[in-house]
């Protein structure tokens, strides 16, 4: 039985992500031995000559044959057999097995396309020979040499995969802390599986790069005499015009692999900017196959993530500074990290399945963990990101998060030290920088454009309605609205007093609702739960002081509660407040009357005032129907055309910080 000592790992990310890259090692096996330096005594020991010894009866496959791709497929078949064995023994659950097996099967299917290319070009080399990759750090031209380099990288990834499966089959039993063997084995197995998922991600990216650099459909795979790069395809064409200018510094269309040190110098020269503080973050993001090189494929993916090359660096720095990017995390690991988090937590990661896409995993208002894909926009020169349905384009990932910040509130943030901001600003920058308040009109226009954004295809779509009974009087002309809102001086004084209290509370409050640009994702429920919790006392005071005109004052006395509701809402288990029995309007509005912050939602009211919807006209133009609500005052008084022109509410003269489009029921 193998024995190993388990020690705690201070980093959230597995240690193998920060090991020296291939081009900086003296032999291939160093990278494999450092995958789990917390389990250094586990089976495999490396010496200075690069030889490998094991203490188990099962050994890692080594290759010294001419048909290297066929041998890679042999390794893959053994891995597939092991995965099925682990699934049958419930070592891997269904999700973990599916994630790992899909990548391995995809790798096998892809490699089959290159057997003919290898045979026709008589490519003969030993994959286990470390001199192929690590003899020197140099620029690699497009052709046979770059193909061999790519195959060697896949070999390394598969060997890492095999090594972790070996460790998973024989977890250690010697421990250094007081716990049971079963719990220790479970802990160790989970750690190994997480590392497997990391290698799985790198393997998928390596095979994606091979397919991009040497597409199976190109003539380069069918030309018998293609010993050079004289073929109809060149990965140089993956680059935009601006990116080609950058790549020309390294040799133009003849070059495929550029060492990181050379690329980074050219990258700084292109932007005419010293960015040493961001080098580790850039290297983590650009060199996602962990081989120490940058290719046209990697640069093109970077542009898909962060926009056209001239603006990509600025967007990338903003993302790093905002501490929202978690990097290359699998969907399974993201779900695990969010499993005990509250509503509003999210994790921003790079998609493994869609090249150049972002994936956002978040906890929705029903405490379910959901996943969202943001696809790169390739049809636009400036790039951007888009949801699949409908295809609204966001300028950057930050624009998307700010647009839906009522749902994406608390980022998990970097899980690797390389993704942290520079030390000079790491403690000074907020989690997310809000847009300038002076750009109010621009934000309003953005809200109008994003009015019908749908999010996840797995969730039913819905739309917003507003409580018509609460808004019926405030939607009227200024004269009628003021007459109904202030029937006597006592009510007016009480309202001014409530406003004063609200302003004092707003100064002291540090709340995530300050990040909201849009009210919610359009497919979520119970959006106003948090707002109702913060405003319970205000609702109660308002109802007691204004029993005769409850509907008129509902919107105007809450801090940020616009009474925006969805079409399907249910009352939660929190206790409901006192209904105003003095109202003659059959008001069914439930108010919170507890002091322990139990939340409840409010059902939609029916407009029984006898007011006609045709009278709810914009207070500015008096032509269009009211369809916007002002924040922070909560008044509904303008149409969408007039609201973008205003800086102060025409009802209460309060400053307008945001405008939200609504739909009446």
Curated annotation (Swiss-Prot):
Residues 307-400 are annotated as: SH2-like. The keyword Zinc-finger applies. Residues 486-512 have a biased composition (Basic and acidic residues). Ubiquitinated. It catalyses: S-ubiquitinyl-[E2 ubiquitin-conjugating enzyme]-L-cysteine + [acceptor protein]-L-lysine = [E2 ubiquitin-conjugating enzyme]-L-cysteine + N(6)-ubiquitinyl-[acceptor protein]-L-lysine. One of its GO terms (cellular component) is nucleus. Pathway: Protein modification; protein ubiquitination. It is found in: Cytoplasm; Nucleus. Its EC number is 2.3.2.27. This is E3 ubiquitin-protein ligase cblA. It comes from Dictyostelium discoideum (Social amoeba).
């Amino acid at each position: 039985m193998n024995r190993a000592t388990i020690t705690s790992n201070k980093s959230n990310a597995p240690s193998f992500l920060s090991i020296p890259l291939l081009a900086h090692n003296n032999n291939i096996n160093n990278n494999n031995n450092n995958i789990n330096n917390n389990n250094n005594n586990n089976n495999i020991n490396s010496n200075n000559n690069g030889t490998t010894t094991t203490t188990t009866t099962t050994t890692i496959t080594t290759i010294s044959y001419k048909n290297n791709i066929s041998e890679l497929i042999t390794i893959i078949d053994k891995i597939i057999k092991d995965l099925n064995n682990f699934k049958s023994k419930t070592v891997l659950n269904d999700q973990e097995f599916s994630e790992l097996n899909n990548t391995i099967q995809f790798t096998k299917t892809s490699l089959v396309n290159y057997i003919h290319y290898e045979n026709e070009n008589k490519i003969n080399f030993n994959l286990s020979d470390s001199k192929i990759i690590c003899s020197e750090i140099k620029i690699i031209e497009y052709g046979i040499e770059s193909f061999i380099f790519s195959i060697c990288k896949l070999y390394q990834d598969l060997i890492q995969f095999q090594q972790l499966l070996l460790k998973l089959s024989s977890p250690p039993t010697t421990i250094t802390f007081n716990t049971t063997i079963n719990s220790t084995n479970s802990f160790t197995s989970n750690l190994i599986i997480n590392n497997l998922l990391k290698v799985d991600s790198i393997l998928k990216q390596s095979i994606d790069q091979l397919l991009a650099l040497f597409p199976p459909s190109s003539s380069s795979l069918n030309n018998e005499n293609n010993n050079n790069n004289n073929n109809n395809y060149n990965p140089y064409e993956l680059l935009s015009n601006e990116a080609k200018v950058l790549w020309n510094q390294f040799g133009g269309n003849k070059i495929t692999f550029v060492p990181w040190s050379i690329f980074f110098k050219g990258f700084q020269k292109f932007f005419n900017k010293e960015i040493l503080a961001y080098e580790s973050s850039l290297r983590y993001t650009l060199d996602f196959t962990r081989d120490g090189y940058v290719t046209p494929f990697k640069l093109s993916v970077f542009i898909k993530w962060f926009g056209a090359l001239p603006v990509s660096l600025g967007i990338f720095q903003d993302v790093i500074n905002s501490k929202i990017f978690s990097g290359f995390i699998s969907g399974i690991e993201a779900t695990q990290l969010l499993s005990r988090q509250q509503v509003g937590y999210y994790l921003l990661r790079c998609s493994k399945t869609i090249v150049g896409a972002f994936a956002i995993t978040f906890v929705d208002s029903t405490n379910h963990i959901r996943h969202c894909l943001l696809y790169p926009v390739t049809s636009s020169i400036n790039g951007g990101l888009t949801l699949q349905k409908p295809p609204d384009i966001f300028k950057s990932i930050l624009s998307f998060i700010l647009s839906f910040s009522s749902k994406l509130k608390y980022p998990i943030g970097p899980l690797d030290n390389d993704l942290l901001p520079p030390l000079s600003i790491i403690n000074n920058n907020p989690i997310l920088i809000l847009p300038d308040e002076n750009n109010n009109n621009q934000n309003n226009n953005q809200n109008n454009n994003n009015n019908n954004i749908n999010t996840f295809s797995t969730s039913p779509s819905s739309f917003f309605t507003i409580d018509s009974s609460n808004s019926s009087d405030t939607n009227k002309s200024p004269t009628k609205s003021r007459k109904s809102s202030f029937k006597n001086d006592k009510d007016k004084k009480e309202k001014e007093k409530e406003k004063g209290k609200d302003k004092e509370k707003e100064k002291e409050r540090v709340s995530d609702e300050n990040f909201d640009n849009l009210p919610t994702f359009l497919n979520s429920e119970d959006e106003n739960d948090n707002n109702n919790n913060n405003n319970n006392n205000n609702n109660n005071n308002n109802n007691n002081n204004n029993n005769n005109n409850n509907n008129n004052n509902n919107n105007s006395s809450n801090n940020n509660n616009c009474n925006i509701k969805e079409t399907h809402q249910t009352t939660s288990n929190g206790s409901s407040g006192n209904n105003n029995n003095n109202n003659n309007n059959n008001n069914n509005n439930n108010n919170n009357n507890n002091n322990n912050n139990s939340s409840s939602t409010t059902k939609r009211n029916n407009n029984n005032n006898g007011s006609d919807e045709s009278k709810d006209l914009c207070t500015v133009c008096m032509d269009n129907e009211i369809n916007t609500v002002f924040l922070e005052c909560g008044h509904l008084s303008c149409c969408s055309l007039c609201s973008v022109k205003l800086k102060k509410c025409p009802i209460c003269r309060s400053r307008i910080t945001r405008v939200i489009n609504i739909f009446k029921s």
